[in-house]
A protein has these predicted regions:
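Predominantly the C-terminal beta-signal and adjacent terminal strand-loop region
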Residues: 4-5, 11-14, 19-21, 172, ...
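Gram-negative (and chloroplast) outer-membrane scaffold detector with strong preference
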Residues: 46-150
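Residues that define the transmembrane beta-barrel architecture of outer-membrane proteins
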Residues: 39-43, 108-114, 132, 161-167, ...
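Membrane-embedded beta-strands of outer-membrane beta-barrel proteins
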Residues: 45, 116-118, 167-171, 187
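Flexible, solvent-exposed coil segments and beta strand-coil junctions
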Residues: 20-28, 91-100, 146-154, 197-201
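Short glycine/proline- and aromatic-enriched beta-strand/turn motifs that initiate or cap beta-hairpins
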Residues: 1-50
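Outer-membrane beta-barrel translocator domains and adjoining extracellular loop/strand segments
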Residues: 3-9, 70-76, 145-155, 196-203
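Extracellular loop and loop/strand-boundary signature of outer-membrane beta-barrel proteins
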Residues: 30-33, 100-106, 151-160, 200-210
């Protein structure tokens, strides 16, 4: 959950503690393996180099989907004027549903996290040509989303843009099989700050939010 502030020529309001989720895409070979469809599901891409036997540095892209839940009841503070809608008014922690006519807000064309990492690998078990290693790491980068937002009667922005930054930590497990193959799983968590979100085709319309 997070607070999201929306600001423009005729409005400045914050919706408080609103819920969002990612968007999972059902697995099909076409959606996940066809290069022309690669941006439909969420994905991670990473390339790196071992500077020491157990230390690597890498560059990656995390293509995520962020979708604000519709029809949830939110508290709103601020004002909206001259929109020509029923939402004009002054709000003071007022309960208001996030309906389609008011707001649709998604980074569903990509909440793209362009990041750099450093990782340490620690082998803790080797048996019968199988090696088990733990992975820990830290990273940082910038956010390059394409936001699909519909705010009141405004046309949406349809461009990629720089919106903020992220920092993260990770841990994982690597199982190396006969030197040439491996299976790896990871858990990554972090903090994202988005102070410059483009919401509509008008450059004066912006939003900001932070979340873990």
């Amino acid at each position: 959950k997070s607070d999201i502030n929306f600001k423009g020529d005729n409005y400045n309001f914050t919706i408080h503690n609103v819920s969002a989720q990612d968007r999972q895409t059902a697995f099909t070979l076409d959606k996940y393996l066809n290069p022309s469809s690669m941006t439909i599901p969420q994905y991670n891409f990473r390339v790196g180099y071992f500077v020491k036997d157990n230390i690597d540095i890498s560059f990656g892209i995390d293509h995520m989907k962020y979708v604000l839940e519709q029809d949830q009841l939110s508290r709103i503070s601020g004002f909206i004027e001259n929109s020509g809608t029923v939402y004009d008014g002054v709000y003071d922690n007022t309960l208001l549903p996030i309906s389609d006519g008011f707001l649709q807000y998604e980074h569903s064309d990509g909440l793209n996290y362009i990041n750099f990492e450093i990782r340490k690998h620690n082998m803790f078990l080797e048996q019968n040509n199988i090696k088990f290693s733990s992975i820990t790491g830290l990273g940082l980068g910038f956010m390059l989303p394409k936001t699909n937002a519909k705010l009141l009667t405004n046309d949406r922005n349809d461009n990629f843009y720089l919106s903020g930054y992220g920092v993260h930590a990770l841990m994982g497990l690597n199982v190396n099989l006969f030197k040439n193959f491996f299976v790896q799983t990871e858990f990554k968590g972090g903090y994202t700050s988005l102070p410059a979100i483009r919401t509509t085709a008008n450059k004066s319309d912006t939003a900001s939010q932070n979340f873990f």
